[in-house]
Design a protein with these regions (language model features):
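Auxiliary Fe-S-binding modules of radical SAM enzymes
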Residues: 1-39, 238-371
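N-terminal juxtadomain amphipathic helix
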Residues: 2-83
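Short, cysteine/histidine-rich loop/knuckle motifs that typically chelate Zn2+
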Residues: 30, 44-47, 91-94, 98, ...
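Cys/His-rich metal-chelating microdomains
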Residues: 34, 38, 48-51, 95, ...
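Conserved Radical SAM active-site core
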Residues: 50-187, 355-363
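Residue-level detector of family-conserved "landmark" positions at structurally sensitive sites
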Residues: 109, 139, 168, 226-227, ...
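Conserved AdoMet/S-adenosylmethionine-binding subsite of the radical SAM
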Residues: 119-277, 282-285
Length: 371
């Protein structure tokens, strides 16, 4: 039986986001590590490798596919109520001890991460998204920057069928990969995991590339939402949250910030779960810093109105939510507040036809059978 590494090596093609160096070395620009890779070696991500001076990258498979509410990504200011067709591959450039997707993200790094690849082509995925009624196709689950060539191929097929596209990422990008990617994406969610470089290094990264990515995405006109998983004792100090939210305000006070609750997972099982009061405290700090749209997520019904979208000018209730479910929608057809006509930042459809949330899924983790 072939090993997972052998299976993945059979599902590659030459990459686009790299430079050739002397002595058959290559420089990969898919993520902020900017790996210089000698012949026969792999990058930090474990899935991009140098084959005699050519960078081989993941291609032609998925490890997870699901169609569910876009609010689950979470995107709260992009086509509320729409279905997001989510797909992912294997591998990540970070190694977070609390990763909730470790079975896919830590493949080839952790022997217990063994999600098998399923062969598929971009056109099939795009057509499947249409068949299931999706509005947007999203690359997620593992870190999509390290599989960016495949993501762009799927996005091209999705755009050809009239679908929007999105990225759910740790944001550890480079200017080169953003040049390659951003013509093909409409929305991008960045996980801003900490505002402390020392803590980021514990996860296998650095803070500065993520901050640069956030600034660059906003400058490029990509709709951007930020998520911070609030981990008690790791990134929840007043000082750190104040610095984080002030940074976001300096980029744009219109950027939605989601603060979500940690639960024990993977290798971090001795840290207490985040409480509702801790989420509300962090969210209130975001508001005090000047962010216009702050959300406390994944503890529905106990975080006050931090699940809802309100007008930044007059506080009119625009979108009422309970978890991923929309209970009221009042944004106008042209994306404005009905009370004061202030434009609501985001990506809005001309009408709201209700929320599609029930779709049949077969077992295999978060993956439907691809046949």
């Amino acid at each position: 039986m072939s090993s997972l590494g052998e299976l993945l090596n059979q599902r590659t093609r030459e990459g686009d986001v790299y430079d050739r160096l002397e002595r058959e070395w290559v420089r990969c620009h898919a993520c902020g590590h900017d790996c210089a890779i000698p012949p026969g070696a792999v990058g930090v991500c474990k899935v991009r490798y140098n084959d005699h001076g050519r960078l081989q990258v993941p291609w032609g498979y998925v490890a997870g596919v699901q169609c569910d509410p876009i609010e689950k990504k979470p995107f709260f200011h992009a086509w509320p109520g729409a279905l997001a067709y989510s797909f992912g591959m294997l591998g990540c450039d970070l190694h977070c001890a609390y990763c909730q997707n470790w079975v896919t993200s830590q493949a080839l790094r952790d022997p217990a991460a063994t999600a098998p690849p399923r062969d598929v082509d971009p056109q099939w995925l795009a057509a499947d998204a249409v068949r299931l009624g999706a509005r947007v196709v999203v690359s997620t689950y593992n870190e999509p920057l390290i599989t960016v060539e495949w993501a762009v191929a799927v996005f091209r097929a999705a755009r050809a069928l009239g679908l929007a596209t999105g990225f759910v990422s740790n944001g550890n990008a480079t200017p080169q990969v953003l040049d390659y990617l951003t013509p093909w994406i409409d929305v991008y969610k960045v996980d801003l995991k900490s505002f402390n470089d020392r803590q980021y290094r514990k996860l296998g990264g650095r803070l500065q590339p993520i901050l640069d990515t956030i600034r660059s995405l906003h400058a490029r006109g990509v709709w951007l939402e930020i998520v911070t998983l609030l981990v008690p004792g790791f990134n929840d100090s007043d000082e750190e949250l104040k610095a984080l939210t002030e940074f976001l305000v300096s980029v744009s006070p219109e950027i939605p910030w989601h603060v979500t609750a940690f639960h024990r997972d993977y290798r971090m099982t001795d840290t207490a779960a985040t409480t509702a009061s801790q989420l509300r405290r962090a969210a209130a700090m975001g508001q005090q810093a000047g962010l216009q749209h702050v959300y406390a997520g994944n503890l529905p019904g106990v975080v006050g109105d931090f699940e809802d979208t309100r007008c930044a000018s007059c506080a009119e209730l625009l979108v009422e939510r309970f978890g991923y479910h929309i209970q009221g929608y009042h944004v106008t057809a042209d994306g404005a507040c009905p009370a004061c006509r202030t434009p609501v930042p985001g990506r809005w459809d001309t009408g709201f036809a209700g929320q599609a949330i029930d779709r049949p899924f077969l077992p295999y983790d978060r993956t439907r059978r691809l046949s």
